[in-house]
Amino acid sequence: MRRYHKMEKIGEGTYGVVYKAQNNHGEICALKKIRVEEEDEGIPSTAIREISLLKELHHPNIVWLRDVIHSEKCLTLVFEYLDQDLKKLLDACDGGLEPTTAKSFLYQILRGISYCHDHRILHRDLKPQNLLINREGVLKLADFGLARAFAIPVRSYTHEVVTLWYRAPDVLMGSKKYSTAVDIWSVGCIFAEMINGVPLFPGISEQDQLKRIFKILGTPNVDSWPQVVNLPAYNPDFCYYEKQAWSSIVPKLNESGIDLISRMLQLDPVQRISAKEALKHDYFKDLHRPSEFLNGVH
């Protein structure tokens, strides 16, 4: 760790503490110190293997993992440093982002996800806090692959409950078959939040989360989602809700935007659009280079 000088603590994420630091060459980076639950066992070798794979991910919309430093009891991941995230930006922009900015960010999120899915790596915990943005308006996904390496804890390093707001209904209902569709659900939730300025499904428990989802998308049944009856938490007595029109949920979205979000936020994971398909959607046909309309992101 002598190569890095800690400058300040910048956050406490799901897995541990994050510091802003400087290396011997004067470059700024982010150090993510991973907390290990099993104090006696040290770092699981599977985790180190998984993390090493992430060093091979190189894409403009993925936060670069520069280095991995591990001792017996501590694992430190060294990432490129970005000083803004989508949550901070949304908090500062009352009423949602400009439509062109939201479109650019969504496209970049999908590019990063498509790349990772092509490499068979899932995120499983996408949320505005781990979508980082630089001063040129380039968006990068952070924490890809960490869920598989360390499992997503119920409570974070600071004992805050890890958010359920972006979690897919199949996962909430106990599905262990994680597929690329779990990330697409999260992206759909983030898309709605960028447009509306508020979270789409701000649940306070797993049950409340499902209820909020069903209130908008309708209560699932065997016809709409054939596999739902096989999920551990499926309850045939779920309160019945009618599906609502997307135009009333995201009124600022145009027709092609509504079509795209409706394909992302399908209850049945099999029916969700893939990242690769989403990138070809009509919604993006008028997209220009990101930097053209992101001069307001600082």
Curated annotation (Swiss-Prot):
The active site is at residue 125. Its EC number is 2.7.11.22, 2.7.11.23. GO terms for biological process: cell division. GO terms for cellular component: cytoplasm; nucleus. The modification Phosphothreonine is found at residues 14, 158. Its cofactor is Mg(2+). GO terms for molecular function: ATP binding; cyclin-dependent protein serine/threonine kinase activity; metal ion binding; protein serine kinase activity; RNA polymerase II CTD heptapeptide repeat kinase activity. The modification Phosphotyrosine is found at residue 15. It is an enzyme of class 2 (transferase). The keyword Protease does not apply. SUPFAM superfamilies: Protein kinase-like (PK-like). It catalyses: L-seryl-[protein] + ATP = O-phospho-L-seryl-[protein] + ADP + H(+); L-threonyl-[protein] + ATP = O-phospho-L-threonyl-[protein] + ADP + H(+); [DNA-directed RNA polymerase] + ATP = phospho-[DNA-directed RNA polymerase] + ADP + H(+). CDD domains: STKc_CDK_like (cd07829). InterPro entries: CDK, Kinase-like_dom_sf, Prot_kinase_dom, Protein_kinase_ATP_BS, Ser/Thr_kinase_AS. Residues 4-284 form the Protein kinase domain. Disulfide bonds: none annotated. Signal peptide: none annotated. Keywords: ATP-binding, Cell cycle, Cell division, Cytoplasm, Kinase, Magnesium, Metal-binding, Mitosis, Nucleotide-binding, Phosphoprotein, Serine/threonine-protein kinase, Transferase. Its main location: cytoplasm. ATP binds at residues 10-18, 32. It holds the Pfam family Pkinase. Phosphorylation at Thr-14 or Tyr-15 inactivates the enzyme, while phosphorylation at Thr-158 activates it. Serine/threonine-protein kinase. Involved in the control of the cell cycle. Required for entry into S-phase and mitosis. Probable component of the kinase complex that phosphorylates the repetitive C-terminus of RNA polymerase II. Belongs to the protein kinase superfamily. CMGC Ser/Thr protein kinase family. CDC2/CDKX subfamily. May form a complex composed of at least the catalytic subunit CRK2 and a cyclin. This is Cyclin-dependent kinase 2 homolog. It comes from Theileria annulata.
